[in-house]
């Protein structure tokens, strides 16, 4: 299995925009792995939003994966067969499913919910 950060590193090296929203700062293992891909420090945009619980990957606004898996070893199936999580997800190019995901992601990214957010105390850098 190819590490997820290695996949992202390859994507940004091809000049493709990558934006990632975290609910909280990643743990030490993820940070150690992230340090192995210095291109990601400047080429990938990241933001924190403590209210984000959705897990989705959107490609060019026309294809999306959404599901239950966190971007962790257990969530992505990297753990042993007896330890990995049971997950599910959908990969689609149906505009009726993709467009609302794009709208939700972009709304959070732009800070549309920041001003009235009840969790601002947990947000390190509110967008608005």
How does the language model describe each region?
Residues 1-128:
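PLD/PLD-like phosphodiesterase catalytic module centered on the HKD motif
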């Amino acid at each position: 299995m190819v590490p997820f950060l290695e996949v992202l590193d390859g994507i940004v090296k091809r000049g493709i925009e990558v934006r990632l929203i975290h609910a909280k700062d990643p743990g030490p293992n993820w940070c150690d792995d992230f340090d192995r891909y210095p291109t990601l420090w400047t080429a990938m945009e990241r933001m924190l939003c403590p209210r984000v619980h959705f897990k989705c990957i959107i490609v060019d606004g026309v294809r999306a994966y959404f599901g239950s898996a966190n971007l962790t070893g257990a969530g992505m199936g990297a753990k042993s067969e007896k330890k990995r999580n049971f997950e599910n997800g959908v990969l689609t190019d149906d505009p009726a499913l993709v467009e609302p995901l794009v709208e939700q992601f972009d709304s959070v990214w732009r800070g549309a919910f920041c001003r009235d957010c009840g969790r601002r105390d947990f947000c390190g850098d509110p967008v608005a």
